[in-house]
Amino acid sequence: MVKGLVDGPFLVINADDYYGREAFKKIHDYMVNTMDADSDVYDLCMGGFVLSNTLSDNGAVTRGVCQVDDDGILKTVNETYNIRMAENGLLATDEQGNPVTVSPDQPVSMNMWGIPAGFLDELEAGFPEFLDNLKQGDIKSEYLLPRIIDSLVQSKRARVTVLGTPDKWFGVTYKEDKQAVVDAVRALIDAGVYKEKLYSE
């Protein structure tokens, strides 16, 4: 829908999540100053959040747990499920329900990506295959951006720079999360991070 309208790098986020100011600034600066739109591989960047800053007090969460090399380049992003705090640390499972080990300080993707305009061609090219592979009656499968990007990383067709941020992510994963989000936004306003009326003069 946006192909032909977007002529420069752009940011992709989940509309119902709060990511923090530093994460936005880092991705903006990368796209303006560093991103190579003419690279032989897709040059992307990603907000890398600390896992412990993205958990819910009200239940388990799913996160894209990242492996990053010493140069800050993404090696893999693995969807990891049922991440929750327990008495002896974090518990989690893979897609098949097998237990996996995760660390509170691991970087995770919260679906915050800096993307060059040319990447839209890749998304368009892959969509028919996604539709062809759907089973009859399947209305739940999603054309997931993290999986597309991870596939391109593994095939050496994309390079993703992970921009670490200490910002605390928050969103409403469970209805019980709502008050905590309201309180967190209020605290940011009271601290002067944001204005009471965001778009006022």
Tell what function each PLM region has:
Residues 1-9:
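Active-site nucleotide-sugar/metal-binding loop of Leloir-type enzymes
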Residues 21-112:
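Conserved core of the sugar-phosphate nucleotidyltransferase
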Residues 107, 161-167:
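Catalytic beta-strand/loop signature of glycosyltransferases that borders the donor
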Residues 178-201:
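Long, low-complexity C-terminal extensions of enzymes
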Residues 9-18:
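Short beta-strand-to-loop acidic/aromatic patch adjacent to the donor-nucleotide binding site
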Residues 112-123:
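Conserved nucleotide-sugar donor-binding
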Residues 124-158:
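A C-terminal functional module that forms or caps the active site or interfaces directly
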